Curated annotation (Swiss-Prot):
Belongs to the Hakai family. It comes from Drosophila melanogaster. One of its GO terms (cellular component) is cytosol. This is E3 ubiquitin-protein ligase Hakai. Disruption phenotype: Lethality during larval stages. Maternal mutants show a variety of defects in epithelial integrity, including stochastic loss of shg/DE-cadherin expression, as well as defects in cell specification and cell migration. Its main location: nucleus. The lineage of its organism: Eukaryota, Metazoa, Ecdysozoa, Arthropoda, Hexapoda. Keywords: Cell membrane, Cytoplasm, Cytoplasmic vesicle, Developmental protein, Membrane, Metal-binding, Nucleus, Transferase, Ubl conjugation pathway, Zinc, Zinc-finger.
C-alpha cells in the first residue's frame, strides 16, 4: 500500500492534483493561481503532511507539488500555513484515513476541504496586506525617453504666472542720456514740445498745461511722447552733454542732418567764373547765326568802313546799290533769272529755303569760286566787302543764300553799266574802276560791258549766262 501510494504521489498524472488543469505543463510553467487555488493547494499540502508523517518520500512529493503550484508570493506565505496547528477534527480525520484503502481516500479528502477554509482567512488577509504594500511601488512608472510632447512637467504646472511685473529699465543699444532742464534728472521717457521740438521729461512736460516752451518761450501745441534711444538732438552752439545750444530734437539722423544743413550751415556763394562762361556760350550762337542781330550790326560796321575807304566815284556807285538791288526782286527773271531768284536773307522765302534745305547741295568750293570771280570783276571796294563776308563762320544754308544774294547784286551792277538809261556817271564809275581789275582774262565780259557805256542788253545777258555757268560748274 505504501509503495502504491508512493507511486501515485509521484509523476505528472496524479489524479487529485490534475483536476481543472491541462496536461503537459512542465516544472515552473504553471498558471497564475488565484486565492481559491492557493487555499486548495494549502489544504492538500496540510492533509498530505499529516497522513504521511512516517514516510519521508511523501514529504518530498508534497514539497514538489507546492513548488509547482505556487509562485513566489505563495511560497512566502505557505510555510506560515504549514506551521499553523490544525484543528482536532482534521487530525482525527487524517488519522482515520491512514487505515483506509486508496479507493475511499478521494471522497475523504473532498470532505476535509471545507474545514481548512476557516483557517485560510488569515492567509488571505496577510496576502492582501502584502499586495497592498507592493501595489504602491508597482504604480510608479519607470522613466521612459520619448520624443512625444507630454506637456509641461509638474514643477512648471505649480508655478503661478499672474504675478505683477514692474519694469525698472529698458535695454537700449548705447543710448544717449539727456537731462531734463526742469528737474535735472535723466530723461527716460521724453516729452517733446511741438512745434519747437525741445524736450523735457514726460512728467515735467505734462505737469501743467504749458502754453509756451520753458526753453524758447514759443507756443506749444501739443506734447509728444518718445522713448529712450529714439531722439536725436542737435548740439550746435553747445556741448553734447550740456544744456546750451540749439537742443532741437528729431526722430532720425537724416532729419537732424537736414536741420543742420538748413539752419546752421551758411550757404556758400555761387562761383563767379561760370557766369562769364555762360554769357560767352550764350553769345557764341549769336555770332555764328548770320541772320542774327549781332552779326547784322557787325556787317553794317564793316560796310561803313569799306565805303569810307573807296574813292568818291566808287562810293557813288555803291550808293546806288539799294536802287539797283531792287531790280532782281521786282523786275522778274531777266538777265539773272537763275541766280537772282534766291531771296535775300531774313525774308520769309529765305527762312523757308533754310528750313527745307534747298541750297544744301552747294559746296564751299563753289562759293569761293563765285566770290573770286566777283572780286575779279568788281572794284577794290566791292572786293574788300566780299573779303569781310568770307571771314564769318560759314553756316551752310544761310551763307549760301547770302553769297548768292550779293552775287546777284554784283551782276546787277554789270547789267546796269550796259543800260543806256543809267547815265554817264554810272558808266564813268565803272570805267574808272576798270584798272582795278587784277587780270584781263575775263575781257570778254569786262570791256564789252563796261567801256563806253554803249553796250546793250544782250551783253548783260551774256554776263549773266557766264555767272550761271560759274555758279553750277
Amino acid at each position: 500500500m505504501d509503495t502504491e501510494e508512493v507511486k501515485r504521489g509521484r509523476g505528472r498524472g496524479r489524479g487529485t492534483r490534475a483536476r481543472g488543469r491541462g496536461r503537459g505543463r512542465g516544472r515552473g510553467r504553471g498558471k497564475k493561481i488565484d486565492d481559491s487555488s492557493i487555499a486548495d493547494a494549502a489544504a492538500l499540502a496540510a492533509s498530505s503532511c499529516a497522513a504521511l508523517e512516517d514516510s519521508p518520500g511523501r514529504l518530498d512529493a508534497s514539497e514538489d507539488s507546492v513548488m509547482q503550484e505556487l509562485d513566489k508570493d505563495g511560497e512566502l506565505e505557505t510555510p506560515g500555513a504549514l506551521e499553523e496547528p490544525l484543528p482536532h477534527g482534521a487530525l482525527g480525520a487524517v488519522a482515520a484515513s491512514g487505515n483506509m484503502t486508496p479507493a475511499t481516500q478521494q471522497p475523504q479528502v473532498l470532505q476535509q476541504v471545507p474545514p481548512p477554509v476557516m483557517s485560510q482567512t488569515t492567509i488571505s488577509l496577510s496576502l492582501a496586506r502584502a499586495v497592498d504594500m507592493e501595489a504602491d511601488i508597482s504604480q510608479l512608472e519607470a522613466p521612459t525617453f520619448t520624443t512625444l510632447s507630454r506637456g509641461p512637467p509638474e514643477p512648471m504646472l505649480r508655478l503661478k504666472w499672474n504675478h505683477k511685473v514692474s519694469l525698472i529699465g529698458e535695454k537700449v543699444l548705447n543710448p544717449m542720456i539727456h537731462c531734463c532742464d526742469q528737474c535735472d534728472k535723466p530723461i527716460l521717457v521724453y516729452g517733446r514740445m511741438i512745434p519747437c521740438k525741445h524736450v523735457f521729461c514726460l512728467k515735467c512736460a505734462r505737469a501743467e498745461p504749458i502754453k509756451s516752451c520753458p526753453r524758447c518761450t514759443d507756443k506749444v501745441l501739443r506734447v509728444e511722447q518718445s522713448g529712450l534711444g529714439t531722439v536725436f538732438m542737435c548740439t550746435h552752439g553747445g556741448s553734447r552733454y550740456g544744456s546750451s545750444g540749439c537742443r532741437r530734437t528729431y526722430l532720425s539722423q537724416r532729419d537732424l542732418q537736414a536741420h543742420i544743413n538748413h539752419r546752421h550751415v551758411a550757404p556758400q556763394p555761387p562761383p563767379l567764373q561760370p557766369q562769364p562762361q555762360l554769357s560767352a556760350m550764350a553769345e557764341q550762337p549769336k555770332m555764328t547765326d548770320l541772320g542774327g542781330v549781332g552779326l547784322g550790326l557787325e556787317l553794317h560796321k564793316q560796310r561803313k568802313l569799306s565805303e569810307s575807304s573807296v574813292p568818291i566815284s566808287v562810293s557813288a556807285s555803291i550808293a546806288s546799290r539799294p536802287v539797283l538791288s531792287r531790280l532782281p526782286l521786282t523786275g522778274g527773271v531777266g538777265n539773272i533769272g537763275s541766280i537772282g531768284s534766291i531771296p535775300p536773307p531774313g525774308s520769309a522765302a529765305a527762312a523757308q529755303n533754310a528750313i527745307h534745305g534747298g541750297h544744301s547741295t552747294l559746296t564751299l568750293a563753289n562759293l569761293t569760286r563765285i566770290n573770286n570771280a566777283n572780286a575779279q570783276e568788281c572794284h577794290q571796294g566791292k572786293a574788300s566787302l566780299h573779303h569781310t563776308l568770307k571771314k564769318g563762320t560759314p553756316h551752310q544754308s544761310e551763307s549760301v543764300a547770302d553769297a548768292s544774294y550779293y552775287s546777284s547784286v554784283l551782276a546787277s551792277f554789270g547789267s546796269a553799266a550796259g543800260n543806256p538809261g543809267s547815265g554817264p556817271p554810272g558808266g564813268g564809275a565803272t570805267a574808272a574802276a576798270q584798272p582795278a581789275n587784277p587780270s584781263g582774262s575775263h575781257s570778254a565780259v569786262g570791256p564789252g560791258a563796261l567801256i563806253g557805256g554803249s553796250t546793250d542788253a544782250p551783253t548783260g545777258g551774256s554776263s549773266g549766262n557766264w555767272q550761271q555757268s560759274q555758279y553750277y560748274r
